[in-house]
UniProtKB/Swiss-Prot annotation:
A zinc finger (C2H2-type) spans 207-228, 234-257. One of its GO terms (molecular function) is zinc ion binding. Keywords: DNA-binding, Metal-binding, Nucleus, Repeat, Zinc, Zinc-finger. It comes from the Eukaryota. This is Putative zinc finger protein R05D3.3.
């Protein structure tokens, strides 16, 4: 027999199992304004967070464009045109920031608003009052457009946008400040004498040597004077080779004494001779400038009509040489009256030489003793009897530099030079 306690326990266990089997129900309470967040969580399901679209960049746009071209060809489009566009796109270099996101493209504004804004900017340009009365001039308040400023009013403008605008004047009706009339001398061609004067102040190509009376290249006038003075400060220690520039001696040592130890370049720079070279080079420029300036004064002054120009130029040159017809060369013991150079000789023939050829051959050397110290110095006396004309000067200053002025004599010319000296 079951005891009462056992039966009581079975009843309690059965009742507890029945309670677990019954479904629990939630009593819905009315929504209150005091707890809106809790009410929304209970009554409605939570919405998923908004997902942003995939950011566009250069690579995605490039892939989309290729897909577009592929679809264009599949739709029956022109294959050649699509391939051409694809080649152009493939030729573009890769941008440095190809992965940066690309923003949306803003829609363009209406053309009517843009044109109104354009006209509002152009209205700042207005006509100024003209001193002389203009019969066909419009009102001073009329605006000026770009087409009117360019003289294109005959072209019909946009018919649908600017119908309310007033007619604008043409560009020819706008006041224009008259330019100052240039003087006849400034507008006309430069005179020959003016060209000579400009050339004498450093823009010429040839000057007259004060030693040999030949036209020499202006850029190489110092080299030419050094050749006259026989100034060769750089020498080879192994032989008698000497030149006026270091580069020639260095090249001689590398080629002729290659591999020989102890061969160096000897330097014997004389400052007195270097200063004399500079002085004589500047004297060449001074003489050329004085010749041109004196010819200008004589031509503009007392040149008569009955006398030939060459004859008067001869008189002027004789007077100029009388003032300074002896060129004193200081600090030099030996002077070469002629520097053998075939190219310069040919150029001098083309320029006709200011001095006569026979006079240039009669150039003589003489020793002039200084009265104070009694030291003999070398000088050049220029004979009188040369001719000059303006055409020769024009050819001199305008002669091209196609013929180089190489002051280094050739082998055959060195023999002639030694025979003359």
């Amino acid at each position: 027999m079951e005891s009462p306690n056992m039966r009581k326990r079975l009843i309690e266990m059965e009742s507890s199992l029945e309670v677990k089997k019954t479904a629990t129900t939630v009593k819905q309470e009315p929504l209150e304004t005091s707890s809106p967040l809790l009410a929304s969580m209970i009554s409605t399901a939570p919405n998923p967070p908004p997902t942003s679209p995939h950011a566009l960049n250069y690579l995605t746009l490039l892939a989309a464009f290729r897909q577009f071209l592929h679809g264009y060809i599949q739709a029956g489009g022109d294959e050649n045109l699509a391939n051409t566009l694809g080649n152009y796109v493939a030729a573009l270099p890769m941008p440095p920031n190809s992965l940066n996101p690309i923003g949306p493209l803003n829609a363009p504004k209406s053309p009517f608003k843009q044109q109104q804004k354009f006209h509002s900017i152009i209205k700042a340009v207005k006509r100024e009052p003209v001193s002389e009365p203009a019969q066909n001039a419009g009102s001073g308040d009329s605006s000026v457009t770009l087409s009117s400023a360019l003289g294109e009013d005959a072209v019909p403008q946009n018919r649908g946008s600017c119908t309310s605008m007033k007619p604008v004047p043409r560009f020819v009706m706008l006041p224009v400040v008259a330019a100052q009339s240039a003087s006849p001398s400034a507008s006309g061609p430069t005179s020959e004498i003016q060209q000579l004067r400009e050339a004498a102040f450093g823009r010429y190509k040839n000057v007259l040597c004060v030693i040999c009376n030949e036209w020499i290249c202006s850029r190489n006038r110092k080299n030419h004077i050094e050749a006259h003075l026989n100034y060769r400060p750089y020498k080879c220690s192994a032989c008698s080779y000497a030149r006026r520039r270091e580069i020639f001696v260095d090249q001689h040592i590398r080629t002729q004494h290659k591999g020989v130890e102890g061969v160096v370049m000897l330097s014997d720079v004389d400052l007195h001779v270097a200063m004399e070279v500079d002085r004589l080079a500047e004297e060449c420029v001074t003489r050329t400038r004085k010749i041109i300036d004196t010819m200008q004064e004589k031509k503009d002054g007392d040149f008569g009509e009955n006398k030939d120009f060459d004859e008067k130029a001869l008189q002027m040159m004789l007077a100029e040489e009388a003032e300074n017809k002896v060129v004193v060369i200081e600090s030099v013991s030996q002077v070469r009256p002629k520097v053998a150079n075939y190219h310069r000789r040919q150029r001098t023939k083309v320029l006709k030489k200011i001095y006569d050829t026979d006079v240039a051959k009669q150039t003589e050397l003489k020793i002039v003793k200084d009265e104070e110290g009694g030291v003999p110095t070398m000088s050049i006396k220029l004979e009188e009897g040369f001719e000059i004309n303006l055409e020769d000067l024009m050819k001199m200053v305008g002669a091209g530099s196609s013929i180089t002025d190489s002051n280094e004599p050739g082998p055959s010319e060195i023999k002639k030079e030694l025979a003359e000296v």
